[in-house]
Amino acid sequence: NGPPPIILAFFFNTALDQQITKFKADNGREPTEDEYQKIKAWTLSTVRGTVQADILKEDQGQNTCIFSTEFALKMMGDIQEFFVHNQVQNFYSVSISGYHIAEAGANPISQLAFTLSNGFTYVESYLARGMHIDDFAPNLSFFFSNGMDPEYSVIGRVARRIWAVAMKNKYGANERSQKLKYHVQTSGRSLHAQEMDFNDIRTTLQALIAIYDNCNSLHTNAYDEAITTPTEESVRRAMAIQLIINREWGLAKNENPNQGAFIIDELTDLVEEAVLKEFEAISSRGGVLGAMETGFQRGKIQEESLYYEHKKHDGSYPIIGVNTFLNPKGMAQQDIELARSSEDEKQSQLARLADFHARNAAEAPQWLAKLKQTVIENGNVFAVLVDAVKYCSLGQITTALYDVGGQYRRSM
């Protein structure tokens, strides 16, 4: 998806600017060139974070694609190559995402199969560029949705099992590379506009199984997501769900409390088998990119989404307060605050952008030209981006890259 490489370059520059400002405050002078390079190297090796930048799930589920798939994959490889050369080891170069695939309608099996197969596609792509598996595998992270289906209670352990086996046996990766790290966000799709207060109950259950399945990090959705961008009050309630589970709920103090339970072990084997079967279906269509050309993933997501909606509307999938156990008093009028930017906020942003353009009017054209030339010569685009963002805006860079990288066109 378009902005992440550029936003990441902004982020790295912000981290570096903070350290340079600190050096000047501590020493009362500008750093020498040698000192600047040492500060830059230390900053890049220390900074922590995650950038999503997953073009494959964009095509399959989220649809915010702006560059051609080939060019987007090249930029992802450029980011990881930059990370390897600059020892950026605490930052995740991609969050390989199943969340958006699930939110678009995929069931938990398809979510996991598509996400892991996308992950292996990135591995093959980076290996083809000459990177060593243990230099980049620890920089990969995953992002899953947790819904109401029982399969979600084992999605993490199945992902870790499949990933570890492939990393060890196929790619000869070390132990650190075999460890799959993943973030879970509770399912926004499972939250409903009817009797919204019930949504906190759904989110609590989803959060609980995510924690029991040893997720590395967790996002709990706000109850009013079905209607608006969450308010301050609803965000506090969502945060309280995590805090109560982690601070008050005693069983959560024990890792993996469901380990060894018959249903968990049985589900783990069944889900793994189903995911491996999906791998075969993808492989028979020429792998992930070959399957994308025929719309295989998108078609499957749409079929599963339609199946869910049918069951929701005919009542065969019970949703309390939506299609069963309806409130006898009817829907109460709910006053929900809709989140909107004020006119002052909009004008302030436009004014700051215009000021940035004016200040860098002399330097921007040469950096945009250098970016284009780097793409034409098949150089590392991200290495140039890190400097170009000091003078060029997101819109200027995107427009320039369209000219040489191509815009996204869906295969019909």
Model-derived regions: residue spans:
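A short glycine/serine-rich beta->alpha loop
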Residues: 1, 104-107, 190-195, 226-228, ...
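Catalytic alpha/beta active-site cores
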Residues: 1-146, 151-152, 170, 179-183, ...
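Alpha-helix initiation/capping motif
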Residues: 43, 54, 68, 132, ...
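Active-site capping/gating regions of soluble enzymes
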Residues: 75, 97, 113-122, 129, ...
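Flexible, glycine-rich loop/tail regions that form catalytic "lids" or insertion modules at the edges
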Residues: 240-243, 247-412
